[in-house]
Amino acid sequence: MQFSTTPTLEGQTIVEYCGVVTGEAILGANIFRDFFAGIRDIVGGRSGAYEKELRKAREIAFEELGSQARALGADAVVGIDIDYETVGQNGSMLMVSVSGTAVKTRR
């Protein structure tokens, strides 16, 4: 499965548009990691705990996106948009949402 943020894939022709596909992942952030991440952010360091959670959520969202595309018989997803949000009480959860158009291609 190929993923692209662009509307086309270089060297390939889109032969069929299968439909819009989406993938979402919402992960709760551990309160102790949140506390220490906040301290590191204050002193200018990077928050490895948040980065790890965002990476995990993004991977899950892309897996879901690919599964939906495969179910439609697609071999690629183009025009992908990736959104990151904090949700829940006091932003206690991380959400990654990806969407795009599932397509069938030919070289």
Swiss-Prot record:
Gene3D superfamilies: Hypothetical protein apc22750. Chain B. Belongs to the UPF0145 family. The gene is ybjQ. This is UPF0145 protein YbjQ. GO terms for cellular component: plasma membrane. Transmembrane segments: none annotated. Disulfide bonds: none annotated. HAMAP family: UPF0145. PANTHER family: UPF0145 PROTEIN YBJQ.
